[in-house]
Amino acid sequence: LRQAGAPLTIEEIDIDDPGPGEVQIRTTAAGVCHSDLHFIKGLHHTSMPCVPGHESAGVVEAVGPDVTYVEPGDHVITCMSAFCGVCRNCTAGRPVLCESTEHWRAPGQPSRLSQKGQPVTQLYNLASYAEAMLVHERACVKVRHDMPLDRGALIGCAVMTGFGAVVNTARIPVGASVVVIGCGGIGLSALNGAAVAGAGTIIAVDVSSKKLAAARTFGATHVVDASVEDPIAAVHALTKQGADFSFEAVGRKETVEQAYEMIRYGGTTVVIGMVPQGQKLEIDAEALLMEKTLTGSNMGSNRFREDIPQLVEFYLSGKLHLDEMVTARVNLDDINEAFAAMSAGEVARSVIVFD
């Protein structure tokens, strides 16, 4: 990506040798995620040029000095929430909010990626829309060799983000009523998480009849087509007093505000979607006095070294519906078309598969 709003280009770049604590990974698969699209459109910002991609899996090819966690041949899923293990948030059990930058290369060191001697930014310190990645060892987790990596890649972002928002951030109790706005990969994962956690009423909201049909496969007990009916009124009709929990998985100001209107007194709204930078939310201040909670979820409040192996087990035991989530498998050359299909709402998830 050379500038926001421009198509992605396929180019040759240089990748450095692994330094201390670093791992080189041969990329096997990478999901096409909305988070990358925000940077491509310029709704969020980073240094250019950059290599996007963060939802990925692959095989370790080489390790640098002091690497003890993985070795060549290990199958891994990457995660952008790398951790240090010693900062305030890490020691409090919230590594997803790690305050350290020690897993980045320090200023003055060579860039991990470069082109003609000029640095190329790794988006989220991963840059997985490439044949190989160079990451810190604390940005990946080993997984079983019988886990298909083209589905395992999705666990590194969409699945962990949506599923984790339900079970880690909200910690919904058995029997809770849940509404999820947005039935892309993250929203479908939130529905799946609600079903696994034992929610009672599970409502999916979207404007795509195709996505709403898929939502039932992932655990929705009811669906609401927001293009033909008032979603707030529909949720209140289904839950009588409003849902116990709502999850916004779109990333729009309007849908966050709708999600908050959908919950009952004492209920909780969890924002998962990436609302554009600078956007302000408007909510009824009086509702706060009725103990209606509005909170965010960063990458599903994950502890990914523990959560990802558990999600792998859920998939292999049939509880996590990754096969149904993968709508298309494409080559890297088709990446712009894959983003166009996602923008048009034609797919739940496309996966780039590398030979």
Where are each of the predicted segments found?
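C-terminal hydrophobic helical "lid"/dimerization subdomain
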Residues: 257-261, 265, 287, 305-355
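Glycine-rich beta-strand-centered segment in the early N-terminal region that forms part
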Residues: 16-30, 43-91, 96, 142-146
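Short Gly/Pro-enriched turn/cap motifs at secondary-structure boundaries
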Residues: 3, 14-15, 47-53, 121-125, ...
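Local beta-strand N-terminus motif with an aromatic residue
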Residues: 73, 175, 220, 242-243, ...
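Glycine-rich cofactor phosphate-binding loops and adjacent beta1-alpha1 units
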Residues: 170-174, 186, 196-197, 207-209, ...
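Cysteine-cluster motifs in flexible loop/terminal segments that predominantly coordinate metals
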Residues: 79-138
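Mid-domain Rossmann-like dinucleotide-binding core that forms the NAD(H)/NADP(H) cofactor-binding site
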Residues: 72, 131, 138-140, 144-229, ...
